[in-house]
C-alpha cells in the first residue's frame, strides 16, 4: 500500500500525480521558504509569498514547530541543502508509513488478529477520503498520530495518573503543532467522546478521569502556545478560517460544516452548496457513531450499539456514493466537500476502520454485509478521489471513476473470498492501474485543456509575462485572479521568481476580504480571489496594486482607469492607470472604510509622497517630507496587531486605515517613522512551549523511579510465586 501511495506523489516514482495543487504548490513552497531561511541562517520572519505578506511564525500551516518539521529543519541547517519537491514528498510519505504502523499497533493491542489487522489498515490507507486529502499535508500529519492518541486516551482513562495525562498531552500537542486546526478540533472531539463512553462502560471515577484529560489538554495547549497565542491575540493568518477575529466560532463551524453555516458571517448565499443535503449524513452521523464504536470495542454490554453503528454507516455510504455520482454527472471539477478541508469524512473513514477490524475479528455479522458497507463508503470516497485525479492527471473525466470501480469491486470479491492469492492479484492490478494512469500510456488517456495549460504553466509559458512585469522598477503590487492560480495560488509568484522585482510585495488578500466584509459585499467570491464588481480602480489604488493578471481571454469588462497592457496566448496583464504609492500621507478623515470605495473628495484623492528607506516585509523605515501637517501615514501592509511604531525615536501606537491596512498618526514637524513587526505573543508563546516541554521531561524523569520500583516488585512477585510452586 505504501508503494501505491508513492505513485500518487509527484517526483517520487513518476513525474505525474493524482494529488491536487495544494500539496505541491502551497505546502511545499511554504515549507521550502522556511527551510531556505533556516539554511541561510536568516530569521524566520515574514513570508512574502503565502497569503501575500503574512508572518511565518503566525501562519499555522507553516507548522514551524511541528516536531518532524523541526527535525527536517535541523538537518537543513546542518547541511544547508534545499528542500525540493522530491524531498518534501518523503515528509508526507513518512506520515503514511507512520499511520500504517500506529494503526497496526493499535489493532494488535486491542487483540485483533494479524490478518484482519492488515486488511483493515490497508483499507484505511486506501480510502478515498485520505487519498483526496493528501493535498492537505496537515490532515495526513494529524491523522497519522490519531491511533496513538486513541491508545493514550484509553491509557489515561484506565490508569488515571499524572504521567498518563502528560503522555496524552504530548501526543495532542504534536497533532496541534501540525497546524491544521479543524482536523485537530475534530480529532479532539472524537477522542473526548471516546473517553466519555469508556468511563461509563468501565465504571472509572468520572471526576478523576476528567482531571487527567484536562491535564492532557492543558499540556497540549501549553506546548502549542507558540501557535495558539498568535491565533488568539495577533490575528494570525489561518486560511481555513475566513474571519480570524471570530476564531473559536469559526473553527467549530469549519469542523462540522465548512459551508453550511454561512449565516454566522451574514451572507448565507456565500456558503450555499448543492451537496449539503447529502452531507447531513456525516455531520450528524460521524460523531454519533463514536458511542456505538466504543461499546463495540470495549466489553460491550448491549448489542444495539454495533447495530446502530452499522445502520449509520450504511446510510452514510449510500449518501456519499450518491453524492459522488451526482457530482460527476454534473461535471463538477470536484465533488462535494471532500476536496475541501473538512475533517469529518476523514474521521468517518477512521471510524469505519475500527468497526471493520473488530467486526471481522469477532464475526458478529456476516462479513459480506460488513464489506458491503465498506464498499458503499469508500466507493463514494474513491469516486471523489478519482474525479479529482481526472482534473490533475492525464485522464478523461470518466476513465478514472470507471477504473476505480473496477478495482474496488475486484478488491471486494477478493476480500470476501479470503484467498491470499486473489487478494495479491488485485493488489498488483491496483499498482498497474496507478502506473498506467499516471504515465498516461493507456487508451483512455486524453490530455484536456487543463492539463495542457498545466504543462505550459509550470515550464516556460510565463516567461513573457514575467519579463513584462520586471521592466517596471517601481514599488508596486501584482494581484492575480484565482483562475490563473488554479495550480499555484498566490505562492506561484514566488515559484516564478516574481519576488525578485524591486520592491515587490504580493497583496495580502485577507485585507481584501476584510474590506469587502466591512462594506457588506454580498457576492464576494472567496478568500484569495478578487472581483472588479467590488474592487474598483479606486480601491486597487489604495492597496498599491498596479497590475492585475488574468488568463488570456478571461478578462472581464474593465471599469474606467484599467487598461490591458500585455497579452499573449496564456496571460493578460491589466494596468491600473493611477495607483497610490506604497507609503503615503493623507488626511485622517480619508482613511475610513467608506472612503476606500467612494473616493469622492479631491483632498482624499491627493496624497503626499514620502521617502522610503531600504525596508523589509517586517520593517519599514520612512522619511517624512518637510513642512507637512498633521495627518495619517498609510502603508500598504496588512494591519496585524504585532506592529510597533516609533516616530522620531518615540514609541507611538498604530491603527488601521480603510479597515484593512496599517497606518500611524503623525503630527506636524515629525521627520521619521519606523515600523517593526514585533508581536508579543510569539516570544511569550515560545517561552510557554519551551517551559511545558521542560516540564514534561522533568515529569518523565521523576516518574522513572516509581515505574522502575513497580516493575521490580512485579518481577519479584512472579519469582516468589514460581519458587513456592
Regions found by a protein language model. Give the residues of each.
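Active-site lumenal/periplasmic loops and adjacent helix-entry segments of GT-C-fold
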Residues: 7-147, 250-279, 645
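Contiguous transmembrane helix-bundle modules in multi-pass membrane proteins
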Residues: 121, 144, 156-169, 173, ...
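Active-site-proximal, structured, solvent-exposed surfaces of multi-pass membrane proteins
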Residues: 27, 597-711, 715, 720
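Membrane-embedded helix bundles of polyisoprenyl
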Residues: 92-110, 114-200, 212-232, 237, ...
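Hydrophobic alpha-helical membrane-insertion signals
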Residues: 1-61, 224, 232-238, 446-447, ...
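Periplasmic/ER-lumenal interhelical loops and adjacent helix-loop junctions
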Residues: 28-42, 50, 70, 217-297, ...
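Extracytoplasmic
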Residues: 428-608, 613-621, 625-628, 638-640, ...
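Membrane-interface micro-motifs in multi-pass membrane enzymes
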Residues: 61, 89-96, 123-147, 177-187, ...
Amino acid at each position: 500500500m505504501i508503494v501505491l501511495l508513492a505513485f500518487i506523489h509527484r517526483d517520487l516514482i513518476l513525474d505525474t500525480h493524482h494529488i491536487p495543487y495544494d500539496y505541491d504548490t502551497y505546502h511545499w513552497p511554504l515549507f521550502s521558504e522556511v527551510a531556505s531561511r533556516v539554511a541561510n541562517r536568516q530569521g524566520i520572519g515574514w513570508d512574502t509569498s503565502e497569503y501575500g505578506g503574512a508572518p511565518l511564525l503566525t501562519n499555522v500551516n507553516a507548522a514551524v514547530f511541528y516536531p518532524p518539521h523541526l527535525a527536517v529543519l535541523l538537518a537543513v541547517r546542518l547541511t544547508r541543502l534545499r528542500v525540493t519537491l522530491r524531498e518534501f514528498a518523503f515528509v508526507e510519505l513518512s506520515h503514511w508509513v507512520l499511520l500504517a504502523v500506529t494503526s497496526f499497533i493499535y489493532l494488535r493491542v486491542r487483540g485483533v488478529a494479524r490478518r484482519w489487522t492488515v486488511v483493515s489498515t490497508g483499507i484505511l490507507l486506501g480510502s478515498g477520503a485520505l487519498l483526496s486529502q493528501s493535498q492537505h499535508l496537515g490532515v495526513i500529519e494529524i491523522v497519522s498520530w490519531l491511533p496513538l492518541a486513541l491508545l493514550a486516551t484509553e491509557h489515561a482513562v484506565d490508569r488515571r495518573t499524572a504521567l498518563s495525562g502528560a503522555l496524552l498531552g504530548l501526543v495532542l500537542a504534536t497533532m496541534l503543532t501540525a497546524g491544521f486546526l479543524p482536523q485537530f478540533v475534530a480529532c479532539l472531539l472524537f477522542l473526548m467522546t471516546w473517553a466519555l463512553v469508556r468511563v461509563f462502560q468501565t465504571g472509572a471515577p468520572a471526576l478523576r478521569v476528567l482531571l487527567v484529560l484536562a491535564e492532557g489538554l492543558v499540556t497540549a495547549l501549553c506546548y502549542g502556545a507558540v501557535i495558539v497565542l498568535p491565533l488568539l491575540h495577533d490575528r494570525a493568518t489561518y486560511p481555513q478560517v475566513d474571519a480570524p477575529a471570530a476564531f473559536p466560532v469559526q473553527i467549530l463551524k469549519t469542523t462540522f460544516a465548512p459551508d453550511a453555516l454561512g449565516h454566522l458571517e451574514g451572507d448565507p448565499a456565500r456558503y450555499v452548496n448543492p451537496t449539503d443535503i447529502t452531507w447531513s449524513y456525516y455531520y450528524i452521523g460521524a460523531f454519533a457513531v463514536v458511542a456505538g464504536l466504543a461499546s463495540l470495542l470495549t466489553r460491550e454490554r448491549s448489542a444495539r450499539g454495533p447495530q446502530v453503528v452499522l445502520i449509520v454507516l450504511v446510510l452514510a455510504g449510500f449518501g456519499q456514493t450518491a453524492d459522488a455520482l451526482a457530482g460527476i454527472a454534473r461535471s463538477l471539477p470536484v465533488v462535494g466537500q471532500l476536496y475541501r478541508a473538512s475533517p469529518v469524512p476523514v474521521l468517518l473513514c477512521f471510524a469505519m476502520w475500527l468497526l471493520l477490524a473488530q467486526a471481522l475479528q469477532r464475526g458478529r455479522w456476516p462479513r459480506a454485509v460488513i464489506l458491503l458497507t465498506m464498499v458503499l463508503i469508500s466507493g463514494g470516497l474513491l469516486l471523489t478521489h478519482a474525479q479529482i485525479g481526472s482534473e490533475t492527471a492525464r485522464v478523461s473525466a470518466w476513465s478514472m471513476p470507471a477504473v476505480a470501480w473496477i478495482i474496488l469491486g475486484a478488491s471486494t470479491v477478493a476480500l470476501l473470498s479470503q484467498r491470499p492469492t486473489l487478494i495479491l492479484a488485485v493488489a498488483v492490478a491496483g499498482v498497474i492501474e496507478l502506473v498506467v494512469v499516471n504515465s498516461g500510456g493507456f487508451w483512455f488517456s486524453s490530455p484536456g485543456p487543463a492539463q495542457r495549460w498545466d504543462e505550459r504553466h509550470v515550464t516556460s509559458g510565463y516567461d513573457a509575462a514575467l519579463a513584462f512585469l520586471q521592466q517596471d522598477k517601481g514599488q508596486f503590487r501584482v494581484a492575480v485572479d484565482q483562475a490563473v492560480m488554479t495550480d499555484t495560488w498566490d505562492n506561484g509568484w514566488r515559484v516564478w521568481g516574481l519576488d525578485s522585482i524591486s520592491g515587490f510585495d504580493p497583496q495580502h488578500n485577507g485585507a481584501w476580504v476584510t474590506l469587502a466584509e466591512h462594506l457588506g459585499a454580498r457576492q464576494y467570491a472567496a478568500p484569495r480571489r478578487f472581483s472588479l464588481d467590488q474592487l474598483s480602480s479606486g480601491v486597487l489604488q489604495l492597496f498599491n496594486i498596479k497590475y492585475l493578471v488574468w488568463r488570456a481571454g478571461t478578462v472581464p469588462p474593465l471599469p474606467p482607469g484599467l487598461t490591458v497592457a500585455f497579452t499573449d496566448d496564456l496571460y493578460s496583464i491589466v494596468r491600473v492607470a493611477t495607483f497610490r504609492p506604497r507609503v503615503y500621507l493623507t488626511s485622517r478623515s480619508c482613511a475610513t472604510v467608506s472612503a476606500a470605495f467612494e473616493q469622492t473628495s479631491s483632498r482624499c484623492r491627493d496624497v503626499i509622497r514620502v521617502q522610503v528607506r531600504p525596508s523589509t516585509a517586517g520593517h519599514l523605515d520612512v522619511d517624512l517630507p518637510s513642512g507637512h501637517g498633521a495627518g495619517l501615514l498609510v502603508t500598504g501592509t496588512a494591519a496585524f496587531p504585532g506592529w510597533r511604531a516609533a516616530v522620531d525615536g518615540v514609541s507611538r501606537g498604530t491603527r488601521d486605515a480603510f479597515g484593512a491596512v496599517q497606518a500611524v498618526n503623525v503630527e506636524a514637524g515629525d521627520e521619521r517613522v519606523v515600523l517593526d513587526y514585533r508581536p508579543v505573543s510569539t516570544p511569550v508563546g515560545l517561552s510557554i512551549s519551551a517551559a511545558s516541554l521542560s516540564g514534561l521531561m522533568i515529569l518523565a524523569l521523576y516518574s522513572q523511579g516509581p515505574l522502575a520500583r513497580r516493575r521490580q516488585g512485579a518481577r519479584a512477585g512472579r519469582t516468589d510465586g514460581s519458587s513456592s510452586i
